[in-house]
Amino acid sequence: GAGQHGVATATVCALMDMKCEIFMGATDVERQHTNVERMKMLGAKVNPVRTGNMTLSDACSEAIRDWCCHPQDTFYIVGSTMGPHPYPDIVAKMQSVISEELKWQLEEKIGRDYPDYLIACVGGGSNAAGTIYHYIDDDRVQIYLAEAAGHGIDTNYTAATMHCGTEGIIHGARTLVMQTEDGQIEEAFTISAGLDYPGIGPMHADLATRGRSHVLAIK
């Protein structure tokens, strides 16, 4: 996607003297060149993925494929709340530092540890998961999530999974997916790197389905 997770992973691997291999869609390699150079400076090998739409979803597929082919010496590290359990849960808990900091900063600045509204963008869902994590069961807080509408949810050029998706399986997770009637994954469209994922983290699919979060498709 945008490459931030790749930079973070490359940094940790450099500190731990471990080999690091990053899979990134060729389209994203071009438009996020600065982050690619950071990864390389940290010693990571960056593999441009040239299949499909050459973006986030294709990079995830290649990373999982490589992991499955080399289980004896490879650990898969994903940066969003996607993939098979327990990955979505691990990522959400790690990202929950965002809402943890929100609580004490709000207490310090306004005298209470909760806001009226939380607003976050959502692609795979990691940043949004971290933002809302400690407030999910707090009904005083309204949750709004913004997903990329692309050219519009009534077109074939959109990444608004929670508006246009149906229940299915992508990268080992059962969630809302942009797919054809026979379950083939459709390509998501948006100019925003990191939001062009044709699925959504299961946590967000659940919250949206039961009305806990309000999802807006931003054009």
Predicted regions located by residue number:
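Active-site nucleophile and cofactor-binding loops and adjacent substrate-binding regions
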Residues: 1-6, 24, 52, 95, ...
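Buried hydrophobic positions in well-ordered alpha/beta secondary-structure cores of metabolic enzymes
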Residues: 3, 13, 39, 102, ...
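Active-site-proximal loop->helix
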Residues: 5-62, 154-165
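Generic transmembrane alpha-helix signature in multi-pass membrane proteins
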Residues: 9-10, 130-132
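Active-site/ligand-binding loops adjacent to catalytic centers
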Residues: 60-90, 112, 137-140, 145-219
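N-terminal small/polar loop signature for handling phosphorylated ligands or for N-terminal nucleophile
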Residues: 64-65, 99, 103
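A glycine-rich, Thr/Ser-enriched phosphate-binding loop motif common to dinucleotide/cofactor-binding enzymes
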Residues: 86-101
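Phosphate/pyrophosphate-binding loops at sites that engage ATP/ADP/AMP, CoA/4′-phosphopantetheine
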Residues: 104-113
